[in-house]
Amino acid sequence: SSDLLSCNPQSEISKITDLTIEIDSGPELLAGSTRLKSGTAQKMVLNMISTITMIRLGKTFGNLMVDLQITNGKLRDRAIRIVEKATGASRAAAEKALSESGHEVKVAILMLLLNIDADLARERLRASQNRVREALN
C-alpha cells in the first residue's frame, strides 16, 4: 500500500496512491520554503496519527502513556508519576507497586487499582490484549 501526506492538494502523485491525506495550509510566508506552515501542518497530522495508533494498540490509559520501558532514572521517575496519576496512590505506594511488578507500569497500575498481586495483574493484561482499561473489568 502506498500512502501520501501532502500540502499540495490535487497533486499528480495523489492519483496513484492508495491513501492520500491532503492539507491545504495555504502559501508559505517565504516563497519556496517547505519547513514553515506546510511542515508544521504535516507534523501535526503525523502526531495525530501516532497518537491514535498508541491508543488503538492499548499503550495508553486515559491521557497517560503507560507502555513505558524503564531504562534510566528519568524514565523511572516518569513511571512513578504515571502510576501515581493513574491510581491516586502515594509516591511510596507507586514505587512499591512498580518494584513488585518488575517495573511494569501497566501491572503496577492494576495491582493498585484492583488490590491484586503482580501475577494476577499480568494474567488480566494477557486476557485483555494488554489493555489496562479492559483488564479492570
In which residue ranges do the predicted regions lie?
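Short, amphipathic alpha-helical interaction segments embedded in low-complexity terminal/linker regions
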Residues: M48, T53-N137
